[in-house]
Amino acid sequence: MHLLTTTLISFEQNKVEYLTQIAIYTQTPVCTDSNCEHARFLKHSLIQVSIERIEYLYSIFPNIWQFALLCQGQNKESLIHMEEDASTNFKLRYYVLPWSRRLQGYQSITVQNGSHVPLVKRLEKWRIFVEC
């Protein structure tokens, strides 16, 4: 498993802004040089697909970490969803795991009208594994 990228994302759920982290891993190494156009495109595409899917999963399971604990029965990584992208034949596996790291400087975000909105840190973070 090879780390491709990691990023923090915010999303709205029930009029509350949440913060979580996603990390995308690939089966085989991918060029991480900033000049590598194909790798940049792959990262951007996978981040977009992942964000859309994660927002969808949160709409189905608002308390996804509690759901994962019930399914797994322990405080460790749980497979939540698996899908295959028809256009690329990539298989994507979505895992959640505990996110205990303290964050500083991410207490709020600025929304479109310029006001600051508080962020609530989720209990879980995401690991997406991409099989080529």
From Swiss-Prot:
It is found in: Cytoplasm, Cytoskeleton, Microtubule organizing center, Spindle pole body; Chromosome, Telomere. The keyword DNA repair does not apply. Its main location: cytoplasm. The keyword 4Fe-4S does not apply. Keywords: Cell cycle, Cell division, Chromosome, Chromosome partition, Cytoplasm, Cytoskeleton, Meiosis, Telomere. GO terms for cellular component: chromosome, telomeric repeat region; cytosol; meiotic spindle pole body; nucleus; nucleus leading edge. GO terms for molecular function: protein-macromolecule adaptor activity. Involved in chromosome segregation. During meiotic prophase, connects telomeres to the spindle pole body by forming a bridge between the telomere protein rap1 and the spindle pole body protein sad1. This is Telomere bouquet protein 1. It comes from Schizosaccharomyces pombe (strain 972 / ATCC 24843) (Fission yeast).
